[in-house]
Curated annotation (Swiss-Prot):
Superkingdom field: Eukaryota
GO function terms (MF aspect): structural constituent of ribosome
Pfam families: VAR1
Presence of the UniProt keyword Transcription regulation in the record: no
InterPro entries found in the cross-reference section: Ribosomal_S3_C_sf (IPR036419), Ribosomal_uS3m_fun (IPR007980)
Cystine pairs: none
Location(s), subcellular: Mitochondrion
This protein's name: Small ribosomal subunit protein uS3m
Family: Belongs to the universal ribosomal protein uS3 family.
Gene Ontology biological process terms, A to Z: translation
GO cellular component: mitochondrion; ribonucleoprotein complex; ribosome
Keyword vocabulary terms for this entry: Mitochondrion, Ribonucleoprotein, Ribosomal protein
Length: 266
């Protein structure tokens, strides 16, 4: 578990663990939770590294595995853990730091839909440990708000990591087939706040050794039509926004990148 030398006794950090219904979409943006202190950028970057180490090292998973850097970085190997987190968002006051993120735990069978509800108490305990470690970094109270997502396609950060994680055992056609055959991802049954999902893979998966290195494959489900603010307001329609993320990792054939676009109605 990542540790930072303690400088003095700190106020007990807070931790909040939420479960989220699978009928909503969640982007990386949280209104009102932007960092208000530019001098905290360096600390925030250090905090991101610690959070990644907790997630990819298995500290937030039921099994402890070899620690590897994961999640936010776009140039590192994907760990064997099935715990994925979004990019955190930071809010600072003089006495407290609030960190908000989403997380998803994949099922043992690597299904796109996770139905496991076990060990939530263990996950909650590990997030509490994370709050304690981050409190030592910031030297103030840290409040971690961790919201569980039950489907990886609700957040682009999580979906890009999830697909890259499953790259060693799947082809791009497998990804496409999963989207087509999984009822929860059919274009007529997308969550109400999601109008479309696009997935693009650049490079070669280990299951596709005969294709060129520069191959780019993409698949789109749903619609990515975007209305201007004025037009949408006049017609009473939804204004769409794009939640975008990419994740780059390596296999024995070289580097490959998974890019994800999620079109959301707001």
């Amino acid at each position: 578990m990542p540790t930072i030398p303690s400088v003095y006794r700190l106020q007990q950090p807070q931790m909040q663990l939420n479960g989220v219904a699978p009928t909503h979409s969640f982007s990386k943006q949280y209104p009102g939770l932007g960092s208000t202190v530019s001098g905290n950028t360096s600390l925030n970057n250090s905090a991101i590294c610690i959070i990644n180490a907790y997630a990819s090292g298995g500290t937030l998973n039921k099994k402890n595995t070899t620690k590897k850097n994961n999640t936010v970085s776009n140039n590192n190997s994907v760990s064997t853990t099935s715990f994925f987190i979004s990019k955190p968002n930071f809010s600072h006051t003089n006495s407290k730091v609030t960190i908000q993120l989403f997380y998803y735990t994949a099922s043992p069978k690597n299904h796109l839909v996770n139905t496991s509800n076990n060990d939530l108490t263990t996950v909650s305990s590990h997030f509490s440990d994370l709050s304690t470690t981050l409190a030592q970094l910031y030297q103030k109270e840290v409040h971690v708000i961790a919201t569980r997502l039950y489907y990886p396609y609700l957040n682009s950060d999580i979906l890009s990591q999830y697909l890259a994680h499953n790259g060693p055992s799947n082809t791009f056609m497998d990804f496409q087939e999963a989207i087509l055959t999984n009822p929860s991802l059919h274009k007529t049954n997308l969550p109400a706040h999601i109008s479309g999902i696009k997935v693009q893979v650049s490079g070669r998966l280990v299951t596709e050794t005969v294709i060129p290195r520069i191959t780019v494959k993409s698949y789109l489900i749903g619609s990515f039509q975007r209305n201007s603010n004025n037009t949408a307001n006049k017609l009473g329609d939804f204004v769409t926004s794009i939640d975008y993320s990419k994740f780059t990792t390596k296999n024995e054939l070289g580097a490959f990148t998974v890019k994800v676009w999620i079109c959301q109605r707001s």
